[in-house]
Amino acid sequence: MASSDGKPLPTPASVGGGGGSSTAPPGQPTTVASKVLDMGAAAMQSLRPVKQAKQHMCTFALYAHDPKRQVETHHYVSRLNQDFLQCAVYDSDKADARLIGVEYIVSRKIFDSLPAEEQRLWHSHAHEIKSGLWTSPHVAGLLEKAELDHMAATFGKFWCTWQVDRGDRLPLGAPALMVSPQADPAAAVRPDLVRKRDDRYGLSTEELRAARADVEAPAEEHPGQADYWLRHRKGFAVDVVPHEMKRHAPFP
């Protein structure tokens, strides 16, 4: 299955498959024994990598092969250093949110060091930040401002592993490359998605846009091969194909 497949055939892993309409993954309710085990493990284990997520950012993403397909995303951000961040991406901020992918975020310095072929997979963040689409829910504007100035000059590579927008109840098929919203009409986020997000958090994207007029955008918003589709009108999709395994002699 390619990441560009529009809709898998009905299965128990898709909405309506198995006779239900829920978008929750198929499976039995968590047992009391499993809950007790989870509580005990959480008390004894450090879970250090997970606990490094210090920020929650909400924005929108578009499929690279079909920008008409758009999803609201919730990034839980870990900062490995000032030039590299890694994000677990969920479909909501609820306790039962589904992990739909991962995004890596790098500074312009790191982006410029990448070969052209690799740069094609990365997108810029300047427009979605200045337009008010990117927000840190419940974070005061003054505290958010310094981070926005920094993030406006960064680049991301986002792989979506669970296409929940088409009703998949499980992660199906190959991962899909995602791109960021842009000023180009072909990459404008649907107003209904923005309105739904704004109503939930009690904010206004239009007001955020006005408040961010002084956010410093990079002089060159699409350097190198960033936002490849904007210039070439071609996206990227992943196909899974059989391949000969490398064979190694057994150890003596």
From Swiss-Prot:
Family matches, as InterPro entries: OBAP-like
Pfam families given in the database record: DUF1264
Region (Disordered): 1-31
Regions of compositional bias (Low complexity) in chain numbering: 22-31
Family: Belongs to the OBAP family.
Protein's recorded name: Oil body-associated protein 2A
Organism: Zea mays (Maize)
Source species taxonomy: Eukaryota, Viridiplantae, Streptophyta, Embryophyta, Tracheophyta
